[in-house]
Amino acid sequence: MEKNVSQVTAQEETALKARGYNEDLLPSSPKQRTMGARNFFTLWMGSIHNIPNYAAVGGFIFLGLSPLQVMLAVVLSSFIVATFMNLNGVAGSKYGIPFAMHLQSTYGSLGAKLPGFLRGCVAAIAWFGLQTFTGSLALLIILGKFWPNFLEIGGSFQFFGLRLPELMAFTLFWLLNVAIGFGGSKILNRFTAILSPLIYVVIIGLTIWAIRAGGGLTPILSYQVSGAIRSVNPLVAYLIIFNSVVAVWSAPGASVADFTKNARSTRAQV
């Protein structure tokens, strides 16, 4: 544990509980700070590699930029996001406080309600819904491959535009995500440690397939979309990409203390 990592005394913890703070809002104890650099690496890599992100990056080439320019813009955007998250995460890694306490220390108990609502209801829930829906489609494809008749269950029944097989896959995938969330940081660390290497196996495999299918790196990096918007200024296109990447990471960036509060040190979360 770093020397500059602050710890809450028993008296301070008692005072916080008397003010209505539950166990989830209390600063992490030294025993709870178990996340090292490897845990954060697998956590963020797992968050980066997902289908909605790939679809968004693929759509950027319609702004009139080449694939190489899009890659450069995404890398620069990632540096901006990483800098913001590292700086904002110090509050959690140093004091062991979660996002809710971080907000209250800045805006007060009343002032913290609005940013907490915006982060929770607008950013987190919307993004969670998108990821869950996308994951459920992947699960539906897998179930359809092993059990083709599953795709015919329910006939023409629909619920908010979802057929019964789609609804079942969505519910199953949603329950899996909720179960992992209720498991806490220990379950999350174990899950990401197992899943992240598998993600890289898939990514490397897809990369090899894409290079072969595209005829090599040179044709891929020089590819121009026929339906691209040619009227967009390149600088404006870069700004659009910057804004898109930063917006995607606004929720985890704002609430990064929920993760860094369990960091062994500030160096580990950086």
Q: Each predicted region: which residue ranges?
A:
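Hydrophobic transmembrane alpha-helices that form the core helical bundles
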Residues: 113-155
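Membrane-water interface regions at transmembrane-helix termini and the short interhelical loops
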Residues: 61-64, 89-91, 106, 114-116, ...
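Extracellular loop-to-transmembrane helix junctions
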Residues: 58-90, 111-114
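Hydrophobic alpha-helical segments and their helix-loop junctions in multi-pass secondary transporters
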Residues: 136-145, 177, 198-226, 241, ...
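Juxtamembrane transmembrane-helix boundary signature
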Residues: 74-107, 119-133
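Transmembrane-helix boundary/entry motifs in multi-pass membrane transporters
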Residues: 36, 97-125, 156-166, 264
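Membrane-interface "cap" regions at the ends of multi-pass membrane proteins
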Residues: 1-68, 214, 232-240, 261-268
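Helix-loop junctions at the membrane interface of multi-pass solute transporters
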Residues: 28-32, 45, 59-61, 100-106, ...
